[in-house]
Amino acid sequence: KETLLDQDALPQLPFDELDRFYPMQHYLNRTFLGKKTLAYHSSMGCPFKCSFCAVVPIYEARWRGKSAANIYRDIKYVQEKWGADSIEFHDNNFFVSEKRTVEFSELMLRENMNWWGEGRIDTVDQYSDESLALMRRAGCRMIFFGAETGNDALLKQMDKGGKQTGEQIRRFAARMKKFDIIPEYSFVLGMPADSPEQVWAQIEEDIAFIKQVKTINPETEIIIYVYSPVPTEGSELYERILQAGFKFPATLEDWLSPQWESFDLRRNPLTPWLTPAMVRRIRDFETVLNARFPTVSDTKLSDLQRRVMQALGSLRYHTGIFSFPYEIKALQKFWLRYRQPETEGM
């Protein structure tokens, strides 16, 4: 395999040149992390081969990160010149190296900047308590993790490095609570199974598991995706979705059709094993969950709006009556524009 580019061998990013053509201030957006949040990439790739991930065919389990010193140099420059007060790391996997994370955190201790990144539960769970405490003191406010499912057999089928388990997902949510770092868990519902009854059972199992996680750590952010197949040829999951009747587009023109554009935007899974009733069940649960636990990343919601949403969602959430939550959808549409991190990002 070809070695990934050594970013440390490159000159410093030309922020001033960019500012000449498109003001840097326009890149610094308001998020729950701060008023001027910088989006930054500190590494390339990911060393893992999850069978549902589109990154795998691109990087083929390769990862290479910029040094902590050079990351800090760039951030410090943008902070001093344009007033950046927080950072979103959009790496596919920021936390591959505990050593690099610790070195970066030590440099950030005096900067008073909140930051967010993406990682793996089974990687960060190997970090020492001292490292996690340091990260929080250095401004680490939230970490995005692909929890995916609480079912160990499905996790194995997804090839989550062979290490992540449902029990670990629950335990890790509690561990993050101890260090006041918000775990942002994404789940993928609607995976293929041998029968419609098994698909239904897995959806209900995942819903119950998500509720368990919220009981363990109510601060856990939950993002739900309906499974959209990815062409990761050679994986067990790839073979299974083909056997279940799913067909990928054959040409570039097919991929550009409105049908597949909707698929790419996660609006329509197009999977033959998922019925409209199944998709509706997932979406209705997501609506109720988001009402009961409004995302902390939505800075536009007032305290009153949050309380009203929580009140509307509470009864449905605790009784399991998720179907047809029209009152919640009407509230979200006409009284507030509820933010969706799963499609809008941070």
Model features per residue range: what roles?
Residues 194-211:
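Catalytic cores of alpha/beta
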Residues 48, 99, 153-158, 187-199, ...:
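Flexible glycine/acidic-rich beta-alpha junction loops that bind and position SAM and/or redox cofactors
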Residues 236-346:
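Radical SAM enzyme core and accessory elements
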Residues 2-4, 44, 230:
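Glycine-rich beta-alpha junction loops
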Residues 1-9, 234:
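Glycine-rich beta-alpha loop elements in corrinoid/cobalamin-binding modules
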Residues 109-113, 214-219:
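Short helix-capping segments at alpha-helix termini
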Residues 15-183, 189-193, 199:
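Radical SAM [4Fe-4S] cluster-binding motif and immediate context
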